[in-house]
Amino acid sequence: MNQRIPILVYHHVYPDGADELNVNKPGECTGVIAESAFNRQMQYLADNKMEVVSTSNVVDWLIDDAPLPEHAVVLHFDNGWLDTFTVTKPVLDSFGFTATCFVITDSANATSEGKRAAIRTKTEGIVEKPFMTWDQIRELVAAGWEIGAHTASHCRMADKLEAEGDEGVLDEVDRPSAAFQEQLGRLPLHFAYPSGSRNTRTDELLQDHYRSLRLWHFEEQPVWSFTENTTSRLAIDCQNIDNTVTFADFERLFEEAVTNG
């Protein structure tokens, strides 16, 4: 039977009542979710015997047909925002869950040096917000999290290719790899495309540097996409989760995974 794996991608998890939750952009993702709503989603996973597995577990399944639990799910957190450490991690700890965090290394470097860091995002344009330090990222690793690459600067890789060619794209690979080696003593195994911006050439350039490349997309009315047995490791599919996703839609995601698997 074809198995379908939901990979849930989050950006910000904020405490209830936080000003940052007041985002209203009709037809667009917000990238934010309240802590209580996130906790409810994690409780749903626990209540329904969903087993949270790592990105590496899924890639082993895709490449080597390694076994996965029948009701596997993967949790991803993009960018390396500070709230991933201060808000998200305690919630996941309470359920015994771990996740993969895809970090922007220029931002982690700057924050670790006491400097401000700003990036351009699909949801907010240029924004300056707190990121994790490398010390905090190392605490995630110690807790069983995987850390993946998300470029050095959070650039759109297809645009980077058009503007700077292969050399520009590879710079967004080499700088994170150097930072990972220096700070974590290892190279990143997995990569997530910022804003899902990619093309065949970027895949070709990145495929020998990472075990997997993850996509990203958003639909106003969620159309769930799953990573399946036939999915390429260069096109790991996922679901964006934020406060535009109702709890009914969240439940439907898992119902579709089971029904159509």
Spans of model-derived segments:
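C-terminal active-site subregion of NodB/CE4 polysaccharide deacetylases
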Residues: 1-76, 83, 154, 158-190, ...
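Aromatic- and acidic-residue-enriched segments that line the glycan-binding/catalytic groove
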Residues: 26, 95, 110-129
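Beta-hairpin (beta-strand-turn-beta-strand) motif
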Residues: 79-80, 104-106
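Alpha-helical scaffolding within the catalytic cores
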Residues: 59-60, 86-87, 124-142, 175, ...
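Acidic (Asp/Glu)-rich catalytic clusters
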Residues: 46, 90-96, 132-149, 206-207, ...
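Non-cysteine beta-strand/loop elements that form the S-adenosyl-L-methionine
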Residues: 102-103, 148-151, 215
